[in-house]
Amino acid sequence: MITVGIPTYNEEKVIAKTIESVLGQIAAEDEVIVVASGCTDNTVPEIEAIVARDKRVRLITEAERNGKSSALNLIIQNASADIIVQTDGDVIVEPDAVGRLIRHFNDPKIGGVSGHPVPVIPRNNLFYEWTLMSYRKIGDVRQQQTAQGKFWHLSGYLLAFRKKALPSVPFAKGAVDAWMGRIIQKNGYHMVYEPNADVLVKAPLNAKDFVAQKARVRAGYYLLPNGPRTVRKELLWLPRELFKIPLNRWPRFFTAGIVYLYSWAKGWYLAKANKSLKQIWKVPESTKS
């Protein structure tokens, strides 16, 4: 048996598709726990409609938006299974992805498994090249670290873990998935990356949403002890990636890069100024359809 946990906040446009993408690949004895936190739209009614027709789905509501850490703890506390798969409320989990994650738990030393996020973004969008480059590079790093036995940074879009490896999640204003990996590692378990467990993720389509998403993640890294990602580390591999892009798209790529650097600066400010969860966790609206 497995438990699939889905934290969600104001995802009325896509939450039903997310849940259905999971239900099609789990067994009758498995369960899906959806935690709706402080929703002010029709997210809860959308979930309730699925609960009414599929007994595998359970809904837990929070009156206020308390962050992903709070929702994850509710999922862990209410999960009937030892293996928990977590995905977000605004993604599509591709067929067989869940099975490809959980097969790794045949090894008792494995405490966490990361899926493979696949960005969805129009080719003519300003951030197209930058988005594909960054996702590809992150995947390459995860695969390399797995081969070296050093992988620990799970992807919050799609991951799985043993409940005994991660009995609770500390409050974090951002990069919750990174904190999860640190705890699993501290508890003596290994983690791996599964490149064939695909999850479709809609990328931000405008500068405002791009900055909102990237800045909150960067703030989370700055708040994480010995955070794994820095501007210096990412700029080191930028020249190599640049020459994989057609020359006529370089201006668009560099423009996106400037916006990206601004998001780093904003993330640093949000972390150092100790801004609240709601101030850090801005919703990129263009990713919600």
Residues covered by each model-derived region:
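A conserved acidic beta->alpha catalytic loop
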Residues: S21, A36-P45, E64, V91
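Acidic donor-binding/catalytic loop of UDP-sugar-dependent glycosyltransferases
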Residues: N42, V91-R103
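Long helical/loop segments within the catalytic core of UDP-sugar-dependent glycosyltransferases
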Residues: I60-T61, S70-A71, L101-A165, A215-R218
